[in-house]
Amino acid sequence: MLILPIAVLCPVVLNTDVLIIGGGPAGSYLARYLVKNHFNGDVTLIDKRSVIYAPVICGELLPSEDLLRPWINKELYGVLLTTLRETLHKEFIVNNIKELNIIINDRVAATMPFRTYLIDKGALIRNIVEEAVNYGAKVRFGTTALKCVGKDNEYECVVHDRQSGEYAIRTKVIVGADAYPSIIDLSLGITNGFNPEDLIIATSARAFGKYDEDKAVIIMDPDLAPGGFAWIFPRGDGIHNIGVGVRNNVAWIGNNPLNYHEEFTRRFGLKQLQRSVLMKTIPVGGLANRYGTDNAYLIGDAVGSVIPTNGAGINPAMITAHLLGESMIHGTNYTKLMNRVFKPLMDRMVLFRRVGDPLLMNRKAMERAMKLSSRLMVSSIYDATLSSMKLSTLIKFLLGYPLIRLIS
């Protein structure tokens, strides 16, 4: 008779006060925030990746401190500034971007000021994780959460560790920071999820190309990136971060994201460093209908923090982590804090994205709009790219709405 070790027959149960699933920008930032601010309890972070932090599926673009100051509300800007100053050290900046080229249907429509940084996201995340560990957090990479359930006013998650196999972690507070859809949300049914038209399938790769080293490029062409846009972000050494964002409701109809990506690289003279193309699903429908329930919370992409008009994800994820951390440290309400600080911007950006959707999905409509008023089109795109909360931007979109419907 084969006698199995007790560890195999009886899953090991680890106990913690806070379990954070996902070690990306949101999860790592929250772990660091809690332990640095003397949270009363153990903080454990797990991530399915075996390497801290790879692979990177991201444009890796962050705003300079002053870029968004005129465009967003003061309280939100204060949180953004905190996330930048606490995480973005000089050694993580790969390249300084000065301008943005906006290409619409193969033509350069405008070149606008765009003080941003191309960063080494992997190095930035590794540093945040290391700081979290130094402050007292427990971190386990190579550990995948399989399912989580409520149990005796706490939560129990079955996880799989590449070295130890399956075991359970018991926790008082559980946080889903594992992108969309989160295993926490799937297990506990916290949100209603997002409709296909509110999701983007984004590709990511690095490529050689003959483009200015201080100019980011976004390409809005519904034949190339229906419902989204393509991007070329220079790293400063002749290599560029590139990708295509395609709306999920059309991504697999007749074509697929990889085909769109290949056409994009061919048309814009880009030669990839590797043949492989990474992909991920990104929510662009604004914040989820709920952010948590009964000490189970969602942050980052899991709660829908990606900016709907530009796909920015790193700092918005950290903003949600900061707000949850603040609520846990000070005993305030995470939902109320999110609704006050972050939701107004997200709701406004969803509105702008939906107003522009008919153009993003129809090349001929995009052409007609450019012929009618290229100046209004370009300024609206630029404002939306900067997440503008200015009244003038709202007026542009409200005035443009009936015109867009008419020409579409």
Please state what every model-predicted region is:
Residues 134-268, 288:
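Predominantly flavin-linked oxidoreductase catalytic cores and closely associated redox partners
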